[in-house]
Amino acid sequence: MALVVKDDVKISEFINLSAAEKFLPAVMTSVKTVRISKVDKVIAMENDSLSDVDLLKGVKLVKDGYVCLAGLVVSGEWNLPDNCRGGVSVCLVDKRMQRDDEATLGSYRTSAAKKRFAFKLIPNYSITTADAERKVWQVLVNIRGVAMEKGFCPLSLEFVSVCIVHKSNIKLGLREKITSVSEGGPVELTEAVVDEFIESVPMADRLRKFRNQSKKGSNKYVGKRNDNKGLNKEGKLFDKVRIGQNSESSDAESSSF
């Protein structure tokens, strides 16, 4: 779900806490901690890319607990001269989900003529600390119509999240209220100035296409084989040792909000 927002991040835009919850010690409330993550950056170097993004950067997690991704603010800046043609679609992905329409949490489209842009997503769901430590979120970037030589960076994206860290799910739904959530599944918003180059293809379909390309050996995104198999020198399949998914996101120098 996506909405245009200002550049700053305010917890009140995502969560309504009572006066008691704001001032009581953490041990006296089920909502242990509301945190804003550090900024994580993704540098878009290709027209199509699927990159890991650390939405919980700098957030102290609770062992054997949970973390709720209450809200996310994404800001972008085109590294281009003024009045360039083209544009981009940005989509947040939960890589745990195998169905592409369920993996897409929300998307946003804008043109290169708008040099700076920002939008927010309200995923509003919890994952376990164990899953969170494996960096389960990705960003799918689809740049179209930008005429730039390969190897240069047309677009920079920054991500910062508002999250709730808690030990137990009990009473959580009674003690916090997520605001501005609409029903009907992921929402795609489009700027009014988007050029005609934007194809009317849902981001879920783009994700499906990208994942299929990756399975065929595409080098745009290298992931772990789902079947945990490999080939020996004779071309026969053999089991490989499973590798964890604690890969680092492709980010630049970050700072705390």
Swiss-Prot record:
Low complexity composition bias: residue spans: 247-257
Residue ranges, annotated region (Disordered): 212-257
Compartment list: Host cytoplasm, Host cytoskeleton; Host cell junction, Host plasmodesma
Function: Transports viral genome to neighboring plant cells directly through plasmosdesmata, without any budding. The movement protein allows efficient cell to cell propagation, by bypassing the host cell wall barrier. Forms a ribonucleoprotein complex with viral RNA. Binds microtubules and modulates microtubule stability. Can bind double-stranded DNA.
Organism superkingdom: Viruses
Family classification: Belongs to the tobamovirus movement protein family.
Transmembrane helix among keywords: no
Name listed for the protein in its UniProt record: Movement protein
Statement: the UniProt record of this protein carries the keyword Repeat: no
Any Gene Ontology biological process: transport of virus in host, cell to cell
Compositionally biased tracts (Basic and acidic residues): 224-242
